[in-house]
Curated annotation (Swiss-Prot):
Family listed: Belongs to the UPF0352 family.
InterPro entries the UniProt entry points to: UPF0352 (IPR009857), YejL_sf (IPR023202)
Name of this protein: UPF0352 protein YejL
Residues in the signal sequence: none
Source organism of this protein record: Escherichia coli O139:H28 (strain E24377A / ETEC)
Lineage: Bacteria, Pseudomonadati, Pseudomonadota, Gammaproteobacteria, Enterobacterales
Matches recorded under SUPFAM superfamilies: YejL-like (SSF158651)
NCBIfam families in the cross-refs: PRK13689.1
Amino acid sequence: MPQISRYSDEQVEQLLAELLNVLEKHKAPTDLSLMVLGNMVTNLINTSIASAQRQAIANSFARALQSSINEDKAH
């Protein structure tokens, strides 16, 4: 069943493009980009989510990330 979001595709795509532009501007390699984005996720969870919900949110995020990974052999 498809997920229904309260955010428009345009909002998501615009924010994604801006974040990618920052990483490209700094010529951040993939490992640094992943470290920074991971730290950002951790910071958001720790500062914006009630402590009782943090583990569940982190688990849900991890599952969503894993399910969105494309397993083709391109790289």
